[in-house]
Amino acid sequence: MRIKRRFTKAGRSAYAGIRFTTRTSEIRNPDGTVVFSNGSVEVPEGWSQVASDIIAQKYFRKAGIPAQLERIEEKGVPEFLWRSRASRDHGEGGTTVGETGARQVFDRLAGTWAYWGWKGGYFSSQKDARAYFDEMRYMLATQRAAPNSPQWFNTGLHWAYGIDGPSQGHHYVDYRTGRLTRSGSAYEHPQPHACFIQSCADDLVNDGGIMDLWVREARLFKYGSGTGTNFSRLRGEGEALSGGGRSSGLMGFLKIGDRAAGAIKSGGTTRRAAKMVICDADHPDVESFINWKVREEQKVASLVAGSKMHEARLNEIFAAINTWDGVHEDAIDPAANPALKAALRAAKGCAIPEAYVKRVLDYARQGYTSIEFPTQNTDWDSEAYGTVSGQNSNNSVRVTDAFLEAVADDADWALIRRTDGKVAKVLKARDLWEQIGHAAWACADPGIQYHDTVNAWHTCPEDGEIRGSNPCSEYMFLDDTACNLASINLLAFYRDGRFMAEDYIHATRLWTLTLEISVMMAQFPSKEIARRSYDFRTLGLGFANIGGLLMTMGHGYDSVEGRALCGVLTAVMTGVAYSTSAEISREVGPFPGYGKNASHMLRVIRNHRNAAYGMADGYEGLAVRPVPLDHANCPDAKLSELAKSSWDEALSLGERHGYRNAQATVIAPTGTIGLVMDCDTTGIEPDFALVKFKKLAGGGYFKIINRSVPAALGTLGYSTSQIEDIVSYAVGHGTFRSAPGINHDSLADLGFGAKELDRLEAASPSAFDIRFVFNHWTLGERFCTDTLGISASQLSDQGFDLLRHLGFG
């Protein structure tokens, strides 16, 4: 393929014009102790402290890089793409270091993609490979786009540094022969895919079965990826087993997987485990599945309340004994000690087990005066939540059109046994729907997946139905396939009051190629996933920061203009991605599964094109028609036309050459990579807050307005002075001088001196709320007690409001 330069120039560094600076990155515990510190993090000067922290703390390879490297000459490969390894002078057990500069990471990623792209025949010449290498590095450095986290973690460790390790049981398909091959090392073929869908057979210990799935999941979690599985093939509780027993059912096995994921999340090298669990609406155990997290969260509530109640009531028993002023033996006798009798009655009334009451009385006889009973709390990472199950996955119920029609008609719904297909139970569809709604309201799970709608847009139905998704549900395809993601930062393509459509299209083309190359170079956790991912080559290009872009342009997120522009941008990206896929297919051939699915895929592409033209009718094979593009309300006429032409090209090129990829785009949440790109909003969601806290390089935080707000106000016609006033109002003035109500004069009347006022002024700019400034840590305990007349018990009370005490209600 021919690669044009748009951001860089031949003969110049990819980083020309980009200034770099050195920053300090730290992680501190709440008590101030340092967990991680790197004082020499080199990043582009325009990057925020948050973005700098993300790349330093999450994406830098922290150890194992040989201090001395040498290039390995490789026949037929351009010199700038030669691999590196520890130099012969380095020796066994030589000094190793970690990455300290962002350029090392950018070079590692882009170099690896270019290396494998060259070997796979994706570039027409060395000039094109060099252009690709430079353009990709530039986009990474300028935060125009980013690949999913596993790429940052794994890609290029072998190519750039010669890092390797023993095989972890992965497989890949050799791009030269098409032969399935067991990986001989951990990193030569990296694991760049974030999203996996895995199957699970109704088999306990064989390959492809239940226990094998936990091993496959562990391989994914170890390298930072996530996985989803539809478990509906597993028989329900009480169904017959071949050996004559009864099945423990779906939930028993889900709890094993949940516990395994919970253990791996804290022992892995990169991040927490990401896991999706799916159950069909007709599974015999679906009701237990729906209410799983609801019941577990009720257990947490019981643990928290019960532990606090035990701690209070048991110590009340001790208090009743300790305050007795008579004979010691009578102190432990409820007949003689009325206070003890009342305390015992209170404990019994709260259902404190008699064994614990007896234990306290025995302790008292031995001279103990109190008991430490560990109390729990509702923090998501607490011991209480670690005790219950169901906390390590997203849960979804998969519903069909038939189920939704049964809900609408208030009809019966049958739950079907997996062993013989007979009815296990009949209930009202609305009852099941109500359970789903209540559970989602109570604990945010389960979600809903619309089986028939998803499969109506399936490009490869000849190879089976789509039954599941990855953990975040943006990727839906065949079982035992994988998707590697990348996101384009939309706001980075908005300059001087207009969206740079040509730059956006250029970036879309190059990132589509990058994701395709990543399929070729990847290894996978099982033979089945390696084969099917190679055969279908699904990609996950998406965007981030749509909320920030719309705000900067002055369009409401929920406005007709905002929705129209979002739709058009999505259409352009997806159309160009499929056009690029067809161009790649022209050079190296379509994906192996394309032949028998060609008519289906072209039907899906025609439906996309129809929607891109804004058509209400004319769709093929769809029971539910999509919402078409709203060209009339799109504020950018050029983008509107590009949305149509990109799909014209996607269809015409596909009809001639086929497609290299069965899917090309998704809209992912872009959590961590959204932060490394300094996105105001991640994924497709609106901004969650106009005012935020910016992390400072030297530590601490500073209250700021979302950087899109001043730009949006300027676009809407506000003057500079008006914008300053609005920003100050939103952020707060950070001072009590001349403030209404609470100011230096009103505080001086209450006894505040110059020292106390100076302390308030110093604390106010970074305060989340004015109440967080007025406390004894800021003002001093002696001032609060001696001058303001506040008791020590009031100061230690977490619910005490000092401002209200001073009369500022």
Regions found by a protein language model. Give the residues of each.
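Extended catalytic cores of very large enzyme megasubunits
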Residues: 1-809
